[in-house]
Every structure is written in C-alpha cells, then in structure tokens.
Design a protein with these regions (language model features):
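Non-transmembrane, aqueous-exposed alpha-helical and coiled segments at domain scale
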Residues: 1-165
Length: 165
C-alpha cells in the first residue's frame, strides 16, 4: 500500500487557514476537519485548519509525513441508504507543536484570515497550573496556551476570534 501523500491525490485548492484547532485526535480529525471539508466542497466555507498539538508527543510528525492528509471512513445510514465510504481529508494546512516551535504558535495570532478557535479539551486539560505564566512558555495547560495566543492577538490589535470549546 502506498503512503498517503499529496502526490497521489487530486490537488486540493489553496485555501487560507481560518481555523486554529487545538488537538489532533480522532474526534477532531473525523468530525471537525471532515465538516470543514464538506463545507469547502459545497462552497459554504473557504478555509483550512492549522492544528495545535496539545502535548509534546502527538500525531504532528505522522500527519506531516502524509502531507497532512488522512482518510475518514463513513459507515452507516444516510437518508435511509446504507453508506460505506472512504474520503481523503484535505482540510488540514499544518500542525504546530508549540513545545518545539513556540514562535510559530504565536505567529497564528498574526493571521488575519484566522477566525475560529476550536478545541475538544476535556476537564483534565482545563485546570489551573501555577507554573503557567506568559513568561514561562510553552505553557502546559490549554487555558494558558489559549491566553497567550489571545494576548498576542490583542497586542497586534487584530480582530478577535470566535472560540468554540
């Protein structure tokens, strides 16, 4: 079997990053990114997601090796019909690991096209960590990372984000 890469799929249109997505787990990729792709295909949205890897160890490198492409398999009923489809998802622009490249993470605040921040952070990721300060980057908790990004956006006097936790 060939490794998934941009060389073996139909070229997706170049679209700006409009979504900053915290998390690269199965739910986020098969639900949020799949929905972005469906909206892009229908002309309802014209953007991609940049994923922020929430932990130092994650799927970022694996996704990069596949040019940020992956397959979602849909099985079930749709409009009363049985479906079993495989779709290559092309709605992810990149993955940023803030533990390795904090500057790239903060640079997301500079992107005028970025409108949305989406997260599927659980209660375990939403907790106070006294070591998480703006000066102590990268922060460990989701709220602290988000605060750092929002503060950077504020410093740049850019428009706010719509945050979907």
């Amino acid at each position: 079997m060939k490794q998934l890469s941009a060389a073996i799929v139909e070229k997706a249109p170049a679209l700006p990053t409009k979504v900053i997505q915290f998390g690269e787990g199965n739910f986020m990729r098969a639900f949020i990114d799949w929905q972005l792709q469906q909206m892009n295909q229908k002309g309802l949205f014209t953007g991609k997601a940049t994923i922020v890897q929430p932990l130092s160890q994650g799927l970022g490198e694996m996704l990069k090796e596949q040019d940020y492409l992956y397959t979602v398999i849909l099985e079930g009923l749709m409009n009363g019909e049985v479906i079993n489809e495989a779709e290559i998802i092309t709605s992810v622009e990149s993955v940023i690991n803030p533990y390795e490249n904090w500057d790239a993470y903060l640079a997301l605040a500079e992107n005028d096209d970025a409108e949305f921040i989406i997260s599927n952070t659980t209660e375990a990721g939403i907790q106070y960590n006294p070591k998480d300060t703006l000066e102590n980057a990268p922060q460990q908790s989701f709220p602290a990372k988000l605060t750092a990004l929002l503060y950077r956006r504020f410093q740049l006097d850019k428009a706010g984000f719509t945050i979907i936790p």
